[in-house]
Amino acid sequence: MMQIDWRLYAVLDTATLGSRDPLAMTAALLAGGIGVLQLRAKNLSVRQTAQLAQAILPLTKIAQIPLIINDDLGLALAVGADGVHLGVDDLPLDLARASFKGLIGYSPEGVADAQRAEKLGVDYLGVGPFAATTTKLDAGAPLGQAGLRAIVEAVDCPVVAIGGIAQHNVAEVRACGVAGIVVVSALLNATNPTQACREFLAHYKE
């Protein structure tokens, strides 16, 4: 399995992207140094999402980073993606692990759920929202440092923080012991996404 740099995990959210070219955005994010790319395409059909994933995969393969499909294990298997990210309402984790050898990420609802997911074999946890976010309207109440740290300390697998993360609070997030940060709108809506990636990574290293 490839070595994964979790520090900057980008989500290519097609709803946030709007009419902009997803392949051009992917190239810009890769040029900026992201370590993981998730494709989240809730506003597209399965066919459209599959076609987009197939177009993105050669780019992520060249960059040697994983492409993770949001929610849909069947689609991840069909296109040969490196991973899938699941939530509490998606396919049960034990079934996912039994049928998929790639990366499985999970968004837990609290410490006990995070520990349960780790026992079922997930590879990483996406925990949030850290702060208030408008990207995912059903994200729930912000965890803040205390809530995030509680989950990080309760598991051994990598934890990436998501939700309301901007350059000004990267240090707060990193102080919780996370493996990395997940950024959506602050990258996709940046004037220069490549530069925005580099700035996030610079803040993460500070």
From Swiss-Prot:
Gene Ontology terms for molecular function: magnesium ion binding; thiamine-phosphate diphosphorylase activity
Binding site for 2-[(2R,5Z)-2-carboxy-4-methylthiazol-5(2H)-ylidene]ethyl phosphate: 133-135, 164, 184-185
Keywords: Magnesium, Metal-binding, Thiamine biosynthesis, Transferase
SUPFAM superfamilies (UniProt xref): Thiamin phosphate synthase
Any GO BP annotation: thiamine biosynthetic process
Metabolic or biological pathway: Cofactor biosynthesis; thiamine diphosphate biosynthesis; thiamine phosphate from 4-amino-2-methyl-5-diphosphomethylpyrimidine and 4-methyl-5-(2-phosphoethyl)-thiazole: step 1/1
EC number: 2.5.1.3
Names of required cofactors: Mg(2+)
Bilayer-crossing regions: none
InterPro entries assigned to the protein according to its UniProt record, in alphabetical order: Aldolase_TIM, ThiamineP_synth_sf, ThiamineP_synth_TenI, TMP_synthase
Note on cofactor: Binds 1 Mg(2+) ion per subunit.
Catalytic activity of the protein: 2-[(2R,5Z)-2-carboxy-4-methylthiazol-5(2H)-ylidene]ethyl phosphate + 4-amino-2-methyl-5-(diphosphooxymethyl)pyrimidine + 2 H(+) = thiamine phosphate + CO2 + diphosphate; 2-(2-carboxy-4-methylthiazol-5-yl)ethyl phosphate + 4-amino-2-methyl-5-(diphosphooxymethyl)pyrimidine + 2 H(+) = thiamine phosphate + CO2 + diphosphate; 4-methyl-5-(2-phosphooxyethyl)-thiazole + 4-amino-2-methyl-5-(diphosphooxymethyl)pyrimidine + H(+) = thiamine phosphate + diphosphate
CC terms in the record's Gene Ontology section: cytoplasm
Binding site for 4-amino-2-methyl-5-(diphosphooxymethyl)pyrimidine: 38-42, 70, 107, 136
Leading EC class: transferase
Chain sites annotated for binding Mg(2+): 71, 90
Function: Condenses 4-methyl-5-(beta-hydroxyethyl)thiazole monophosphate (THZ-P) and 2-methyl-4-amino-5-hydroxymethyl pyrimidine pyrophosphate (HMP-PP) to form thiamine monophosphate (TMP).
NCBIfam families linked to this entry: thiE (TIGR00693)
HAMAP family given in the database record: TMP_synthase
Family: Belongs to the thiamine-phosphate synthase family.
Name of the protein in its database record: Thiamine-phosphate synthase
